[in-house]
Amino acid sequence: MISADGAIALGLDFGSDSVRVLAVDCQHGTEIDTEVVYYPRWKKGLYCQAAQNQFRHHPLDYIEAMEQAIRQMVKRLSEEQRQHIVGIGVDSTGSTPAPIDEQGQVLALRPDFADNPNAMFVLWKDHTAIEEAEEINRLCRSGEFADYSRYIGGVYSSEWFWAKILHVTRADVAVREAAVSWIELCDWVPALLSGTTAPQDIQRGRCSAGHKSLWHPSWGGLPPRAFLAALDTSLVNDLDYPMFTDTYTAERPVGQITAEWAERLGLPTTVILSGGAFDCHMGAVGAGAQPYTLVKVIGTSTCDILIADDQRVGDRAIAGICGQVEGSVLPGWIGMEAGQSAFGDMYAWFSNLLSWPLHQAALTQPEWQPQLKQIESNLLASLTRAWAQNPSLDHLPVVLDWFNGRRTPNANQRLKGVITDLNLGTDAPTLFGGFIAATAFGARAIMECFEQQDIPIDNVLALGGIARKSPVIMQVCADVMNRPLQIVASDQCCALGAAIFAAVAAGAHDDVPTAQRHMACNIERTLIPDPVQVVRYQQLYQRYQQWCHTAEPHYAPVTKVIH
């Protein structure tokens, strides 16, 4: 053990657009400093085709942004503070895997694959593997094998590990022949910084393996060779089998930072790397979540985390969610994951739609660009204010929040967004109100998915930029869910959670609950449901559910007729 007094832990949060580094005092939880750097290639739209649901991240985006963020922040610390940095924790989006070669190098870092999107990290929201996910689901339900989707909600998603591997393996012969394994981003960064990227040395995180890779101790780890071979023999002939057997909870040390990376980042060579996990799971820890608290990590999408005890769950498999994994959030507790595939992304889509004339005007009148950009940047805030001033629910359009498919309940990435009940009196603020209600309805559907299976929800926490900056949207969520909604007092809970795990791995605290008591953030405010609005939203929610049942069959896969 080392003393927590004066010790500093760093949390690295790899998001969809940027990486954030946060320095935290291990004794008092003070957030000392932070830095955010955007991914340069991603910002230019490289390697992505939104119309085909292809979203890829070049590994150099992660490396360059991480190096810049840490160096810039560390420069602002005193020499004494720099020497007291004891650990680094890492969280990331997920499932965001990439292919690696025999040396553990991500293929896109090699000259022969430098511009090949299939050799890069396949971002969580990449849905190019819908058909492959359906293959996995059919095989799980075929009766030929045990149902290996049992503990991930019964539906394997196109956003997850094996579906993405299967899609890329079939689409790209060169990648298939060069790759010996695949690695999640949250596992790769600690391995990179500690020099343990060789496939046999990688410490696979319990969180990513259990929620996305069909890993479970009841069948000895990953599904058997025969199951993967039945999907495609390349999964066992071209890739290492088993890809891994053991998994580790995130408070376990991965290793010590290498001398090269210590110098590049301006850090002591004694820094310890803790295990990686997904952003929302670490965000729940940073928010101080306790058992049976539903933690909503709200951003472009949402990830919802619930911690339950093994005795309550027993051997039950909770249907319709994104997995139940012992140790994926807190060691010794079952972490359950759910989420909405689009939340902030829906608002951004609506903003972009309305901004089209502004973009055209900027092209023809370049001198107007500063004013037009200002109008566009204020658009969502203006819409929110306009609707809040006249929040009529009498003619509110019903919107289905499937603009990026549906993650929970019951993952189905074929689904598309639906807007109904428009009339000639529907204006932009009213339609935006329908979007706000839709995201709240999606949140309630997740809550009910747990409760209907005897998993109680005693408390609801919301964290992230939208949660803190948009009380109007959060109040609608409280009214729709008919629950007090606690807003967490930090925009950086995911990075804070990563720092908490780093503090434990480095020995500044004995265990995660102790570290939480010292370092987790506080509640900023609590929103109470409005009884009148609760009743009115209940009626709209029933209509939302009716439209869900009506619309979903229209997105079933079309049977191909062979002539």
From Swiss-Prot:
Any Pfam family: FGGY_C
EC number from the UniProt entry: 2.7.1.16
Keyword Cytoplasm: no
One of the record's GO molecular function terms: D-ribulokinase activity
GO biological process terms held by the UniProt record: L-arabinose catabolic process to xylulose 5-phosphate; pentose metabolic process
Keyword line: Arabinose catabolism, ATP-binding, Carbohydrate metabolism, Kinase, Nucleotide-binding, Transferase
Metabolic or biological pathway: Carbohydrate degradation; L-arabinose degradation via L-ribulose; D-xylulose 5-phosphate from L-arabinose (bacterial route): step 2/3
Reactions catalysed: D-ribulose + ATP = D-ribulose 5-phosphate + ADP + H(+); L-ribulose + ATP = L-ribulose 5-phosphate + ADP + H(+)
GO cellular component: cytoplasm
UniProt similarity note: Belongs to the ribulokinase family.
Entries under HAMAP family matching the protein: Ribulokinase
UniProt cross-references to PANTHER family, sorted A to Z: FGGY CARBOHYDRATE KINASE DOMAIN-CONTAINING PROTEIN, RIBULOKINASE
Name listed for the protein in its UniProt record: Ribulokinase
Natural source organism: Yersinia pestis
Gene (UniProt): araB
